[in-house]
């Protein structure tokens, strides 16, 4: 079994800890000859060099005594346990430090901060939150507040997350406008999903607050248009989305179908189509392609939609666009050709499904729907409004 790479970094650390342990032994008036290291240290180092990290740690634990001067050894071991995923052992080490009465305030705060990180990695969120809350007013307060913000996001407590983010802005001079806009939008989306007048009113307030937190963010106008449609106000939806055409045109792909439907509802389909085609020319997206083809089929008939889709496919070859073209072509084909088209659809569809996913640019998590926060790594704004095929094509 190959030694884990982080153990290569641990070896110099334990040489240093051995020197420290020898000094402690001398101070304590031990019977060993001057400069001799504790036997457990050599035993642990032997295990480490023989690629037996579990036994090595057990031996090094034997070196660590309750002498107040061995605090740094405790911290080193606890952090190594956590890095290896042995959160139970890390918790025991750091909890022991927190409960010791001979530590000064700074050492106890350090131990409490490490313990909070142990709990967080172990998924013990309530205990982690309690540990970080207890660091209020300490030198670890800012770092603990970052973890408290992380915890609030994990449990989707958006009002609490807003409070923590605003404190980081106020007390630490950090910028969290975009984060706060997302939290507000999450609250707006939940309120809108209620389908009630009260929910829509709450959504409107949160969307306005999100826009104030980050005026350049594309998410609030997208939600504002969705809210307008929920209130049967297509003109209001168009007004909400129009800034995207100028400021974040690629994100209009996420509302392309509704954009065209809203323009059709107010008798301005041609104007809406022309605007979306200009966006598509500069920022091609499969979702926009499909939205235009579907809207043309609905408003002007299958043949015009098919002609437009064929021309678009020639300009920008795409397997996903081909799948849409075949779907448009099938109803117009005679019975003999329809069988061939359906065969082509069966061949194309599996690969098209693979290419139709969105991809997180941070962790690579792939999803069939667009996410503002990646389900894999929990980071915000890591999905482009483009499918895998478009990203791979560059």
Residues covered by each model-derived region:
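Short coil turns that delineate tetratricopeptide repeat
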Residues: 68, 102, 106, 139-140, ...
């Amino acid at each position: 079994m190959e030694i884990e790479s982080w153990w290569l970094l641990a070896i110099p650390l334990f040489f240093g800890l051995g020197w420290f342990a020898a000094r402690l032994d001398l101070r304590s008036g031990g019977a060993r000859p001057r400069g001799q290291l504790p036997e457990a240290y050599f035993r642990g180092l032997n295990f480490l060099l023989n690629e037996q990290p579990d036994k090595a740690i057990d031996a090094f634990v034997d070196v660590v005594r309750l002498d107040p001067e061995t605090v740094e050894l405790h911290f080193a071991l606890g952090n190594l346990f956590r890095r290896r995923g042995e959160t139970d052992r890390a918790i025991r080490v750091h909890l022991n430090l927190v409960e010791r009465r001979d530590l000064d305030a700074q050492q106890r705060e350090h131990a409490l901060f490490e313990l909070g990180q142990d709990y967080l990695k172990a998924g013990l969120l309530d205990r982690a939150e309690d540990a970080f809350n207890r660091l209020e007013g300490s030198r670890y307060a800012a770092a603990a507040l970052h973890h408290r913000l992380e915890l609030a996001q994990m449990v989707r407590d958006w009002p609490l997350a807003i409070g923590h983010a605003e404190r980081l802005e106020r007390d630490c001079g950090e910028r969290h406008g975009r984060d706060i806009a997302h939290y507000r939008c999450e609250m707006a989306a939940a309120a809108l999903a209620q389908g009630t007048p009260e929910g829509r009113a709450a959504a409107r307030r949160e969307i306005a607050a999100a826009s104030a937190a980050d005026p350049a963010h594309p998410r609030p106008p997208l939600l504002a248009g969705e809210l307008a449609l929920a209130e049967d106000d297509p003109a209001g939806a168009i007004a909400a989305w129009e800034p995207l055409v100028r400021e974040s045109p690629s994100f209009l792909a996420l509302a392309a179908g509704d954009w065209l439907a809203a323009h059709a509802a107010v008798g301005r389909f041609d104007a809406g189509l022309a605007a979306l085609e200009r966006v598509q020319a500069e920022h091609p997206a499969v979702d926009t392609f499909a939205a235009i083809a579907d809207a043309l089929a609905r408003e002007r008939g299958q043949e015009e939609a098919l002609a437009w889709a064929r021309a678009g496919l020639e300009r920008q070859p795409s397997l996903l666009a081909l799948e849409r073209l075949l779907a448009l072509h099938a109803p117009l084909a005679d019975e003999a050709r329809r069988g061939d088209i359906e065969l082509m659809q069966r061949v194309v569809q599996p690969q098209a499904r693979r290419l139709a996913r969105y991809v997180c640019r941070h962790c690579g998590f792939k999803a069939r729907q667009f996410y503002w926060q990646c389900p894999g790594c929990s980071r915000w704004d890591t999905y482009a409004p483009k499918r895998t095929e478009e990203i791979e094509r560059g």
